[in-house]
Design a protein with these regions (language model features):
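Fe(II)/2-oxoglutarate oxygenase catalytic core
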Residues: 1-140, 148-172
Length: 172
């Protein structure tokens, strides 16, 4: 959260009504990307989250059979998107992370790490599974980037929500 508060270069958001009336490609959060150009700045703060993610990813591959379907060594991370969502805002549109015609066509898996607890609302909701994942500090959620994992970020109703999201790509 301190990383976000000290970040000067983040993208601003729209109001909830403006976003609902706009193109579905517009987001209603504030975010910045930690990538190869600036990761050294964030490395010490993000290192423990990435170590925890690596353990969760190995568990995910074992539990789902992804280890036999894919060579796990063929996965690599993309940029880390760190988001701040204000109360009653967020990206409420049902979507998948693997859309035709976008740069994300090679996305295989999505992962999110919740950076704070949200008492009311703020869940990641999966349409076809009737499942809502409540934000808890350090909780890691991993899912396939394509159908049927249609999902949305529900608005936090009490307090702000901080989340780190990234994508696992398959090396060509």
């Amino acid at each position: 959260i301190k990383l976000f508060e000290n970040q000067d270069n983040f993208n601003n958001t729209m109001s909830r009504l403006s976003a609902e009336r706009s193109s579905i490609l517009h987001k209603q959060d504030q975010h910045f990307f930690a990538n190869k150009n600036n990761i050294k700045i964030w490395h010490s703060e993000l290192k423990s989250m990435i170590v925890n993610f690596d353990m969760a990813f190995k568990h995910y591959c074992e539990a789902t059979g992804a280890r036999t379907a894919f060579d796990v060594d063929n996965f690599h991370y993309t940029s880390l998107k760190i988001q701040k969502t204000l109360p009653t805002e967020g990206y409420h549109v049902w979507h998948i992370e693997h859309g035709k015609g976008y740069e994300n066509e090679a996305r295989a898996l999505v992962f999110s790490i919740y950076l704070n607890d949200v008492e009311d609302g703020g869940e990641t909701e999966f349409l076809h599974f009737s499942k809502r994942v409540k934000p808890k500090t350090g909780r890691i959620v991993i899912w396939p980037a394509s159908f049927p994992y249609v999902h949305r970020g529900n608005p936090p109703l009490s307090g702000e929500k901080y989340i780190l999201t990234s994508w696992m790509m398959l090396k060509p």
